[in-house]
C-alpha cells in the first residue's frame, strides 16, 4: 500500500538584502522612466555615473576596512543610494556635482559609521544636502518639461563642454511659489508654465510614478504603512492649517504640496529606511509625521524651496529619542514587577 507523503508546511523567511535592494530598484523604474521622458536623458547619465562612483567608493572603503568586497558589492545597497541620488539631482547636473554627492553619501554617510546597517543618517539625503550647499546654482538647473535636452546636449552639459541655455534653468513650481508674491496662486497656475494640474508641471507625474512604485513596495511588505502615512499626513495637515485660499501670500494647497517636489519619493523611498528611521510602528508614525511637518515649514518659511532632505536628516537625529519613548511594552512585564514588589 502506498502511503501519501504530503510536504510539510514551511515558514517563509524574510527576504535577504540583495532581494530587497532589487525590489527597491525595480520600484524606482516608473519614476526613473517619467523623469527621463519629461526632462531628457540627463537622468540616465546621472544614474550611470552615480552607479560607477558608488561601486568604486564601496570597493575602496571595503578594502580599507579589510572586508571581502565581493559579498558586499553584490548586496545592491550602493546602487540603491546611487539611484536615489540620480533621481533627486537635476538632470543637467555636471559630473563633478554627482561625484561629490555620491562619494560623500557612500564614504561619510555609510562607511564612516560602520557600513550597511550602522548609518544614523540616510546616505542619499546626506549626499544631496552636501550637493545643495556646495553647488547652489547647479542644483537649480531643472529643464522645462516641454523643452528637455536631447542625449547629445545632456552629455555636453554633463561633461561641462557647453554653456547651458536659459531654457534648461527653468524654475520649479516650489521656487516660483516661494519667490513670486505679486500674483495669486490661481494666477500663477494660469500664467506660469512651472505649474500643472495638481502640482508642479512634470513634478506631479513624477510624484504619481513614485507613488505607484511605493505602493508596490508596500504590497510586497518591505515596510509598513506607518512612516509614509505619517509624512503625508503631517504635510497635508500643515498645508491645510496654513492654507488661506489662493491669495498672493498663500503657500499652496494641500494637494499642491503632496504632488510637488520630492514628496512621494521621500514618503516611500526615504523615510522608510529601516536603519536611519524609527523601529517601532508608533515610532515610525511619529518619525514620518515629523518629516512631513518639517518639510512644510522649510517650504513655507525656510531658505530652500523643498525641505524633504533637511527634514529627513533632522528627524534622523531624533530617531533614537523616538525609539526610547516608543519602545513596545514587554508582555507581562509590569504585572510581574508589581507581583515582585508585593512579595508574591
UniProtKB/Swiss-Prot annotation:
Q: Name one Pfam family in it.
A: NQR2_RnfD_RnfE
Q: Which residues carry this modification: FMN phosphoryl threonine?
A: 172
Keywords from the named record? Cell inner membrane, Cell membrane, Electron transport, Flavoprotein, FMN, Membrane, Phosphoprotein, Translocase, Transmembrane, Transmembrane helix, Transport
Superkingdom of source: Bacteria
What is the first-listed, main subcellular location in coarse terms?
Answer: membrane
Q: Cofactors per UniProt?
A: FMN
Q: Where in the cell is it found?
A: Cell inner membrane
Which segments cross the bilayer?
A: 23-43, 44-64, 80-100, 120-140, 198-218, 222-242, 252-272, 285-305, 306-326
What is the membrane topology listed in the Swiss-Prot or TrEMBL record?
A: Multi-pass membrane protein
Which GO BP annotation is one of this protein's?
electron transport chain
Its quaternary structure? Answer: The complex is composed of six subunits: RnfA, RnfB, RnfC, RnfD, RnfE and RnfG.
Query: What family is it from?
Result: Belongs to the NqrB/RnfD family.
Protein name as catalogued: Ion-translocating oxidoreductase complex subunit D
Organism equals Pseudomonas paraeruginosa (strain DSM 24068 / PA7) (Pseudomonas aeruginosa (strain PA7))
**Gene that produces this protein:** rnfD
